[in-house]
């Protein structure tokens, strides 16, 4: 047992017996419980999950899509969310009070979501208001905590996804002169630049120094980017692209917009997870692709398209480590606990936070 497991609250510790069970036995038990529970159990699985987990998901998709699908399954009393913490929070906020959302491993967080906590954000908003007055509107990527979504909700802002970021940023500028984009600076920068906003009219707020970083005239700043990033997509570099161009000049390069501006600019295509999946799906047989996104998804795409030559843009990439905490043993543990009439790792968002966060979510859903 690791030190991390020893210091966890007892309800989040995986019992020892799951470490000794065979994969075959665990898979058999998951199937038995799924069959027994029927429609009262719903298992959403994020695209970045391991195959050992995704094989049992009732729906696969991105975070918001899965939360919406979970909310539409009114028959399901238990939603065992195979993703990370902020995704389970969103599912809890969109489902009914009678439905129970469970995260198989409470350590499955998101480093990017954790880069913007509510205290830092409230402090930043206060300081930025001193500089810019009532000229700002906040937008947050759905990859953020419920508290940050709620902050945006009560301040007239909204959430965005990587698929609809352009639409939502365009909307934001019909509301206010300036935009504060949380927590992923890269998605914010790439989206704003794609809409014609020059880089020198963007600034970065550093929550650790409580300072605004910018190159141009402060009065001309239109976009304030939170200094956060995805730890996975940050690892794709221009050097990776140069190596592909040199060794495979006929290979298409497609990346997620959570990659930095320089990588997106040097790629052939950039878009959401769904965009990447659809692009490869519709590509002709024999086409060649280097993909800049999470490794579990890249490997799954490779398996699904043996007629195409597909590689990771960075050959030394690792999967998302926090997403990978959800594994077959933790999934089975969650299901067997439910089968016994018990509940572990329940995700429950405060009522007021939920109300304000849903405001932000609905402002997005009404416009896309």
From Swiss-Prot:
Query: Keywords, A to Z?
Result: 4Fe-4S, Cytoplasm, Iron, Iron-sulfur, Metal-binding, Pyridine nucleotide biosynthesis, Transferase
Keyword Lipid biosynthesis found: no
Which residues participate in iminosuccinate binding?
Answer: 46, 63, 141-143, 162, 256-258, 273
Q: What is its EC number?
A: 2.5.1.72
Per its UniProt record, what Gene3D superfamilies does this chain match? Answer: NadA-like (3.40.50.10800)
Binding site residues for [4Fe-4S] cluster: 110, 230, 320
| GO molecular function list | 4 iron, 4 sulfur cluster binding; metal ion binding; quinolinate synthetase A activity
| Source organism superkingdom | Bacteria
Please list the cofactors this protein needs.
Answer: [4Fe-4S] cluster
Q: Where does it mainly reside?
A: cytoplasm
The entry's cellular-component GO terms read:
cytosol
Biological process according to GO: 'de novo' NAD biosynthetic process from L-aspartate
Task: Note the SUPFAM superfamilies from the entry.
Answer: NadA-like
Q: Which InterPro entries match?
A: NadA, NadA_sf, Quinolinate_synth_A_type3
Which reaction(s) does its UniProt entry say it catalyses?
iminosuccinate + dihydroxyacetone phosphate = quinolinate + phosphate + 2 H2O + H(+)
Establish whether keyword Flavoprotein is in the entry: no
* Summary of the function given for this chain in its UniProt record: Catalyzes the condensation of iminoaspartate with dihydroxyacetone phosphate to form quinolinate.
What protein name applies here? Answer: Quinolinate synthase
